[in-house]
């Protein structure tokens, strides 16, 4: 009969971050840690859990703004604060090959790239920026190459997100709007604007649900949920007024549902 192995009881119980360090270290002989009765806060995660560091990735000149990973190719993309085109780039790292950095960074923006997002199919990489534009890169056998883009908003573009089927994407801006785009079979202009959803305040974040609903987080703390009717028109489904006391910087839908998690500062 198969042998059942009991979990080890002498494992490391906690960790801490040294005063001048960036990574947590195991604490030997730590006292017994009580089981959590509610989700741990950041301080508890830092002091009572051990997440082994695998690698540090370098290359940017300033603090990071956005990080994303493609689960198809295991590529990691990162961006940083930038006031010049030289720093407004996407750097790629191959997690399957010892986090080897790509030879060339992806260029095209002139100011900070505020969000980078891989399409679910792994073919495209979307970026949005403080320069009020979005750009898209397409994966080829030799790597990602610049493909399409547009200066689409009147103010900073804070977020960009892909629909589950990888044919549509949304961009959220400080100009109080979310624009929905779709890829089309047109060699001259392989994308078109589907619609513009106007909000009552600056839109800071946007995401798609698995059923195609669209959620947006506003600067005033509101969360709005839109759904698409059978005739293709978008309708405001739910408004969570002043759901937070500050800007809703991220919204996330459950993988197999419509409900959201929202995060402010």
What positions do the PLM features span?
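WD40-repeat beta-propellers
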Residues: 1-2, 39-43, 79, 87-95, ...
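Short coil/turn linkers that define WD40 beta-propeller blade boundaries
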Residues: 98-100, 142-143, 186, 231
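Canonical WD40 repeat/beta-propeller blade segments in eukaryotic WD-repeat proteins
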Residues: 62-69, 111-118, 154-162, 200-209, ...
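Conserved strand-to-loop turn within each blade of WD40 beta-propeller repeats
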Residues: 79-86, 128-131, 171-175, 202, ...
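Terminal intrinsically disordered, low-complexity extensions flanking WD-repeat/beta-propeller proteins
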Residues: 1-62, 200, 204, 219-222, ...
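Short C-terminal beta-strands that terminate individual repeats in beta-propeller domains
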Residues: 47, 55-59, 102-108, 146-152, ...
